[in-house]
Amino acid sequence: MITRNSIILRRLYPTAIIRTLATDATESTVVKTKRRRTIFTDELNKGPSFDDFVSGKAKDMLEDPLETARKDPNAKLPSWLKVPIPKGKSFHNVKKDVRELKLATVCEEAKCPNIGECWGGKKSEATATIMLLGDTCTRGCRFCSVKTNRKPAAPDPMEPENTAEAISRWGLGYVVLTTVDRDDLVDGGARHLAETVQKIKQKAPQILVEVLGGDFRGDLSMVEILANSGLDVYAHNLETVEALTPHIRDRRATYRQSLAVLERAKQTNSSLITKTSLMLGFGETDDQVKQTLRDLREIGCDVVTFGQYMRPTKRHMKVVEYIKPEKFDYWRDTALDMGFLYVASGPLVRSSYKAGEAFIENVLKKRKHNVGETPRLAQEIKPSIY
């Protein structure tokens, strides 16, 4: 606001002098305060000085974070989660064919710790898990390391043929076909999966085929298409207990929807083996796991596997607890007592881990010898899974 005094000052004194007087008056009234100390400042003060760097003493004062983590026992994985580096002729042959035929495998994309054991086994025991419909998922679950995108590339029309060719070439006894979720496709990729199964059976009818499929956004007619494709095992993973599902899986995947998928598969083709997998270590309780097993038995699910959740990267959710091997034994015995046809349970067990062994040594032997009490059979043939 312009006052009479300010007009008089402007007439008597030049503008520069007025600005100087105003600045001096302001500075005289400002009380200078010390800058607040910060954690960063404190850390700098604790560290080496410029003279320490010049004299070479700094290297003795600084800690290498990688070396510190290596020496810290709490930063290490438990001994039961360590695996040898993948190697061997069979392993490299499978890897070579995967590259040549431009196939994607969940073994590599999901950084599975069992890749060396599954790919490196004998032909009759080896298991490969081929990931169809590309390597990019339309969903983003907090535990999964597979790439995500709302609009992945269109499916390769030659993928069913190339997959069947590769599998027949390897001479595997069992193959697992899995897939990324393709919510961008009208049928969710169900017909693409069914075609792949049919081509495999045409080229190598002796191979047992398991398909680990998605929920097709709850469209159960797509489940029926896949269940009637000629596959031997229909798998769909619950991943975790009901209470934790919204926090761990993509919001489009629900616990009840997954149960409905497994139930419809069995209703469509009663000869199918239905299978699911649970990861432990998210903070689930024993009561929650037991309720999940009861829910699975109510819909007639035949096979369940338990494995330890292992954080793929720092961008994914943290591990709440590393479950001990003894606890996995407990869950195996508990599930068998509830009537599951077969249970694989161990820290390194994954949905498709030793799938061929599980199916061949349990289901086929049961059918061949007409064994009545399945849980007892499964207990007698407990494989070494860790």
From Swiss-Prot:
It is found in: Mitochondrion. This protein may be expected to contain an N-terminal transit peptide but none has been predicted. It comes from Candida dubliniensis (strain CD36 / ATCC MYA-646 / CBS 7987 / NCPF 3949 / NRRL Y-17841) (Yeast). Its cofactor is [4Fe-4S] cluster. Belongs to the radical SAM superfamily. Lipoyl synthase family. The keyword 4Fe-4S applies. Binds 2 [4Fe-4S] clusters per subunit. One cluster is coordinated with 3 cysteines and an exchangeable S-adenosyl-L-methionine. This is Lipoyl synthase, mitochondrial.
